[in-house]
Amino acid sequence: MLTLIDPNDERQAFPPPDAALKEPNGLLAVGGSLSVARLERAYRRGIFPWYGEGDPILWWSPDPRLVLFPEKLRISRSLRKTLRRRLFRFSFDRAFRAVITACAERREKSEGTWLTADMQSAYLAFHHAGFAHSFEAWQDGALVGGLYGVAMGRIFYGESMFHRVTDASKAALAFAVGCLSHWGYRMIDCQVYSSHLVSLGASTIPRSEFQALVSEYSETSVDPEAWKHAPGDFL
């Protein structure tokens, strides 16, 4: 039975993740809002919103869960060659709005978008609150790839990525994983199975194991100053 989240009750707790439906896989709750407080409460439990235009807000905790441990990142020979050629320059938190807009445009062209205007506004507010972050790849001064997600505890919850030229999103991910690992993040959540992400080293784990890691990695936080270190500079 789905839990209905009252949009007027910011203190209402989410149900335990293991109460999620088996079909559709991981659907946990419906309703509520996309306020900063609500999003923070969700991500601290490993829960994320995902819904289409015209649908109510849906909250998910799928089983199994796709994750990428930084040390497991797999860089192909061709991508390694691309990185050695220095075709891209990288930054983080330099163009969050542009990254999320590009992610929405990509999905809209291919499969319809879940990144509605409300979702984009919510994550932009989450970014201003210091929780959501972006990584960017640039070429000749143009934004050609990137990704965004949510940093909570020692977990980075990846949300979406895009590319406009070959290998730009993969290169941005490699840069992001390097930064996140250096700063002390222990796990990158990739939500649901993707053959593309599996080829880069991601793997599925049972929800019970994922939730145990959420609890463990939420006990300590990465120094927020890490995200303030040269935040608009190219690296």
From Swiss-Prot:
The keyword Cytoplasm applies. Keywords: Acyltransferase, Cytoplasm, Transferase. GO terms for biological process: protein catabolic process. Its main location: cytoplasm. Its EC number is 2.3.2.6. It catalyses: N-terminal L-lysyl-[protein] + L-leucyl-tRNA(Leu) = N-terminal L-leucyl-L-lysyl-[protein] + tRNA(Leu) + H(+); N-terminal L-arginyl-[protein] + L-leucyl-tRNA(Leu) = N-terminal L-leucyl-L-arginyl-[protein] + tRNA(Leu) + H(+); L-phenylalanyl-tRNA(Phe) + an N-terminal L-alpha-aminoacyl-[protein] = an N-terminal L-phenylalanyl-L-alpha-aminoacyl-[protein] + tRNA(Phe). The keyword Transferase applies. It comes from the Bacteria. GO terms for molecular function: leucyl-tRNA--protein transferase activity. InterPro entries: Acyl_CoA_acyltransferase (IPR016181), Leu/Phe-tRNA_Trfase (IPR004616), Leu/Phe-tRNA_Trfase_C (IPR042203), Leu/Phe-tRNA_Trfase_N (IPR042221). It is found in: Cytoplasm. It holds the Pfam family Leu_Phe_trans. One of its GO terms (cellular component) is cytoplasm. Functions in the N-end rule pathway of protein degradation where it conjugates Leu, Phe and, less efficiently, Met from aminoacyl-tRNAs to the N-termini of proteins containing an N-terminal arginine or lysine. Belongs to the L/F-transferase family. This is Leucyl/phenylalanyl-tRNA--protein transferase. It comes from Methylococcus capsulatus (strain ATCC 33009 / NCIMB 11132 / Bath). The lineage of its organism: Bacteria, Pseudomonadati, Pseudomonadota, Gammaproteobacteria, Methylococcales.
